[in-house]
Design a protein with these regions (language model features):
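N-terminal positively charged helical leader segments and presequences
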Residues: 1-100
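RNA substrate-binding interface of SAM-dependent RNA methyltransferases
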Residues: 39, 47-49, 61, 102-190
Length: 190
């Protein structure tokens, strides 16, 4: 872990993965910057746990041990975390205010709203990244959370996607219009 990643980590700056295989795959991806590995005290050494710990040590990733209850608060999914969680820094994640304060504004943005199926969100993110969209507006509510199903459906592109966090899509679009952006809307119910 770099000194820069220690300073930069905040849940809005990345994603927390959980599960043994996803954590190992993320640790083995040299393009991903990992902040911290979280392990349950109750994990038995050997097998994939040893592989995870070895890979984390090789990359210089800080490892923290927790009781199951504390780990479940980190993973937010105690039934499926398998005693492993991993904080991944996503350099493309920004707040809308930071984007608007930047000297170089994005040229094309995609605003998401009301999409509650995580697989659909992941596929949209994957398509937007492939299309070269400069930013994806992601509201705090009214959309599937950035979790394992979104990550899987995005085929890993979410780690490098230009996600712009905002309170609501409506307030974000209002701010963008006030800053000279043109807005076009697609609605399935129009």
């Amino acid at each position: 872990m770099t000194e820069d990643s220690k300073r930069r980590w905040h849940p809005s700056a990345g994603l927390t993965l959980f599960g043994r295989k996803p954590a190992l795959e993320a640790l083995m991806d040299p393009l991903l910057e990992i902040h911290c590995l979280h392990l349950a005290n109750s994990n038995r050494s050997g097998g994939i746990i040893t592989q995870i710990m070895t890979e984390a040590e090789r990359r210089g990733v800080e490892t923290r041990f927790h009781d199951r209850q504390a780990l479940s608060r980190i993973s937010k999914n105690w039934r499926q975390d398998q005693g492993v969680a991993l904080d991944v820094i996503c350099p493309g994640f920004q707040a809308l205010d930071a984007v608007l304060a930047s000297s170089t504004l994005p040229r094309s943005l995609l605003a998401l709203d009301g999409i509650t199926n995580p697989q659909n969100v992941g596929m949209i993110i994957r398509s937007a990244v492939a299309a070269g969209i400069d930013g994806i507006l992601y509201p705090q509510r009214g959309i599937a959370s950035l979790g394992p199903l979104v990550i899987k459906a995005s085929a890993g592109t979410i780690f490098r996607a230009p996600i712009i966090h905002c309170d609501t899509t409506l307030s974000a679009l209002s701010s963008l219009k006030a800053n000279g952006f043109h807005v076009a809307i697609l609605d399935a119910h129009a």
